[in-house]
């Protein structure tokens, strides 16, 4: 039986699904999704979910917390967290400045975890769910 670990870029998956399907799949059970990708002879040994917690936006924070709490209580997903870094955006037209949060560490966390799991022989097959091309190099490694 082949051991499978699924690595999920939560931020990328969320915005990709939202862009493609609007709100239809925002409550996606990522462990069920992972199981649906298996072929005969494979067994899911872990689903690893990578994200950063939203800050300074109470409505978004609450929605994210609610979703992650639901996943934690109904699945065996393992969670890994990055962070948000606030960059200042300047409007050249009007001179106004405003904060623009940027997710950090998710790609690094996924790549690190994937390589550590490969090195310690935790899986035979790794499935990466992301649309981020930054993750191509660790996959090719």
Describe the role of every protein-language-model region.
Residues 78-141:
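Nuclease catalytic cores that cleave nucleic-acid phosphodiester bonds
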Residues 1-99:
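Domain-level signal for Mg2+-assisted phosphodiester chemistry and nucleotide/NA-binding surfaces
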């Amino acid at each position: 039986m082949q051991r499978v670990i699924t690595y999920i870029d939560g931020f990328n998956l969320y915005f990709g699904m939202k862009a493609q399907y609007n709100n239809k799949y925002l409550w996606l059970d990522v462990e069920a999704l992972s199981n649906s990708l298996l072929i005969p002879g494979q067994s899911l040994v872990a689903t690893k979910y990578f994200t950063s917690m939203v800050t300074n936006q109470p409505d978004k924070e609450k929605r994210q917390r609610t979703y992650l709490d639901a996943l934690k209580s109904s699945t065996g997903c393992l969670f890994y967290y990055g962070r948000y870094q606030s960059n200042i955006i300047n409007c050249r037209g009007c001179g106004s400045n405003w904060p623009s949060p940027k997710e950090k560490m998710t790609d690094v966390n996924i790549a690190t975890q994937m390589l550590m799991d490969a090195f310690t022989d935790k899986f035979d097959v790794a499935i990466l769910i992301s649309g981020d091309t930054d993750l191509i190099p660790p996959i090719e490694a």
